[in-house]
Amino acid sequence: MTNYLEFLKTKQKTHISSGFDINDEMLNSNMFDFQKFIVKRALKAGKYAIFADCGLGKTLMQLEWSNQVCKHTNGKVLILAPLAVVGQTIQEGIKFGIDMSNIEVVNYEQLDNIVVNQYSGIVLDESSILKNYEGATKKDILENFKFTPYKLACTATPSPNDPMELGNHSEFLDVMTRNEMLSMYFIHDGGETAKWRLKGHATKLFYQFVGTWSIMLSKPMDIGYEMTGYNLPDLNLLENQIITPKRQNGQLFNDAIISATNFNSELRLTKIERLDEVVGIIKSKPNENFIIWIKQNEEGELLKKLLPEAVEVKGSDTNEWKKEKLLGFANNEFRILITKTKIASFGMNYQNCNNQIFASLDFSFEGLYQAIRRSYRFGQKNEVNIYLITTDTMSNVKQAIDYKQKQFLLMQEEMAKAVNLNLSGSIMSSKVFDVIQENNEWYNIKRGDSVQLIQDLQDESIGLSVFSPPFAELYTYSNHIEDMGNSKNYNEFLTQFNFLIKELHRVMMQGRNVCVHCMDLPIQKGKEGFIGLRDFSGMILKAFEEVGFIYASRITIWKDPVVEMQRTKALGLLHKQVKKDSTMSRVGIPDYVMIFRKDGERSNPVKNTDLSVDLWQKYASPVWMDINYGNTLQGYRNGREENDEKHICPLQLDTIERLIHLYSNKGDTVFTPFMGIGSEVYQAVKMNRKGIGFELKESYYDLAKANLKSVVSLKSQTTLF
């Protein structure tokens, strides 16, 4: 038991500190108290992420972190930053009196020219570059700095509308790989090409986990510090919607919705109207600075003709030109800057400009947020005016942005709560619960962890065991670390499963069987990089054989591939895929019942004298074609809780009935370590056996208890008459 409890501790996801402690007096005197707190925390962790909103001094914090790492290691630190930010970062270092002799600041594009093993520390400025998890840049960063002892990631928006992107930071900081994080905290929402989202049960635990290796704040108050000097000015979001000329679309009005496919063509069709609106706004404020954000090069060309004094920074410009003009605007060398968000929306400080115009809005919340934050940041003295030029044909773009903003604010709120919990040391790995039991002459059921509860069963007391184990990462039942479904990968699942089946071998009578219901599992391209099947039944077979069971038989249960296709939208089952490239097609995935036997003396054999030849031939078929998938205990949906995800439907009573009939005697004890809503125990009691069942999830346990009371009541009525 001690080994098992130690294993459970390893499932509690925390970040192990690998850094060093430092006193406030040793830090740069220009820092605010909250900044010193963050830098000390990052230095102690060794590998850390700072998700601080714009204007909170990320540049100063990363420079001082780098300075202290240089002193501690007597080595060098590399800061990777967007091109336009490199110059500002160096200027900030000089401004605050930081020794830059061992701190090198270069842009991401120079990564191929860097000898990485010369650095003791690495800083990723605007680390949201990691969001492109399949990109070459991310791959190079992960590989090149894998063995760098000190790492820091800094950005304002780690994941504006997709918390999964936080996993890229986790992987960079050597906390948990992206695939491990997907298995532990995320679920694949139908189909083999669908996206991943946070499991309902995992939301709180995920943000608490992130809070062990990062800090997120939108203001100092989020981590308990005073707001003196950190009050933002008013932000005016001014939407100017243009009604476009009527088009020949066969409808009374123009289409109000666009997609990513026709987005660029729509911009070209509305270019004149939108840019005329831009020019009108700028001419109304002839003495004020403006940033104009565009999407297409043609927009920049036309604006340059309409506004000759403006300076445009394009992607095709030389690095020297970009750097000179982006810094020049910050230094008030000209008053109108035309550029794209992908060029200048990260890292630049444009407090000298309180007017921005989005000449063309797209679906990217992060681009919009980062661009606005160039001007709307702590330290800005004037109210900020953001002009959003939209058209009646692109109404869904603004709706998408609004939705993503809500997601971002939710993430900020959850992260702030988790960080505060972590700061006070009050994070719990699992909800504490008491074991609940219901015991009578027909059944003994308990609510709790089956690995711990099975310790109380007597040696060789079980005549038959029937169960369907948690399918590793496929389904999620609860937020407990004891839940085998909450595993970061299959190795972790099998390690925990092994603790159970060792005990199962002990409690099984000699010569008796364990029946495991399972299936092979689909591999999603979005997670593994390819589409295929995982041999889950093979993993179970290997695990049982390793503890001493004999692999005795396998029953295949037919399932309708049409139903599977409609439910999962699996690429391999789609008819259009057969016509496109049938090498990617596959058959439906059947269920299996794996039969394992404990060898030894057969002092109490199972003699099925009532089993007819016809029925035996039906049971002996290697494929059971006639299992009624609708014949299950009803009401299992009532056992679902608010945050529950997908669940395996209860095991079919037909299957359980045949296994109990074939492999046990009346009066035997039938055991299931994963009781669910009580199907195996229910059928055992109905067939005059005693049932023992364990279930971790309270709502399922309560439903099982009700189901078992009903079958006992039914037996009493049958006996009475």
What are these regions (language model features)?
Residues 45-65, 671-683:
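Walker A/P-loop
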Residues 59-64, 74-93, 160-165, 295-297:
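Conserved Walker A/P-loop ATP-binding site and its immediately adjacent core
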Residues 291-293, 301-302, 308-344:
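Conserved helicase ATPase core of P-loop NTP-dependent helicases/translocases
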Residues 75-76, 121, 138-222, 380:
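Conserved P-loop NTPase motor "coupling/switch" region that bridges the ATPase
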Residues 351, 440-703:
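Core catalytic lobe of class I
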Residues 363-432:
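A conserved SF2-helicase RecA2
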Residues 266-295:
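Conserved interdomain hinge at the start of the Helicase C-terminal
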Residues 11-50:
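Conserved pre-motif I regulatory segment
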